[in-house]
From Swiss-Prot:
Compartments it resides in: Cytoplasm
UniProt keywords, alphabetically: Chaperone, Cytoplasm, Nickel insertion
PANTHER family per UniProt: UREASE ACCESSORY PROTEIN F
InterPro entries per the UniProt record, alphabetical: UreF, UreF_sf
Protein name, per record: Urease accessory protein UreF
Stretches that traverse the bilayer: none
Any one GO cellular component localisation term in the record: cytoplasm
Chief place where the protein resides: cytoplasm
Protein role: Required for maturation of urease via the functional incorporation of the urease nickel metallocenter.
Amino acid sequence: MNIHRECRSLLSLIQIVSGNLPTGGFSYSKGLESAIEYGWVKSLEDFLNWQKQWIHEQLIYIDWPMLKRCYYYTKINDSKNFKKCALQILSYRDTYELRLEEQRRGKAMEKLISQWYDPISDSWAVAFKCSGLASMAWLGYEWNIPIKNLALGYAYNALESSIMVGLKLLPFGQRTAQKLLRYLVEFLPNAWDKADLVKDHEVGGNFLLQSIASACHEDQYSRLFSS
């Protein structure tokens, strides 16, 4: 029985982080498209530095700590504090496009959750619509996905999506893309250990270059991605 539960948990994790579902990230670049357009990211080294900065600034100090807190509030059925966390996540998306992406993912997740878990109270549904990350935490708990696995799956999806952006806009091919992904995921276990210890007053990152690139992307004339 436990083996079957672990299998269901693994399959649920694969589904929840899939980039091909409405909640996926392959249509977003989070400012990376503009960074490449303006020459801030023009080599593999630049690309790797961008991703590592995302891991060490945003993932460790914003995304994972907030995912963990939303997961906890789901566990204790505290919709009030869950909503506060969802709004806090949204406040950390400090450009129009980053906020819009977070809300679009949240609304897509809310529609799926409402179909699978009917009825859902308004207090939860409103929070889901605010944040895709918060919605993922709720669904991850409901699907018995351990928080560490959920966090690693989220990060893997984000890195894979960024590499897909690079694959389209930078001069490297599929084999290099696989090597990049393999290299970057090696940072994740230690990164999670750090994120797991982040206290409430320490939450908050400063990936300033991403914010600037995202703001520039709003007015970019020709673009392939939504952010």
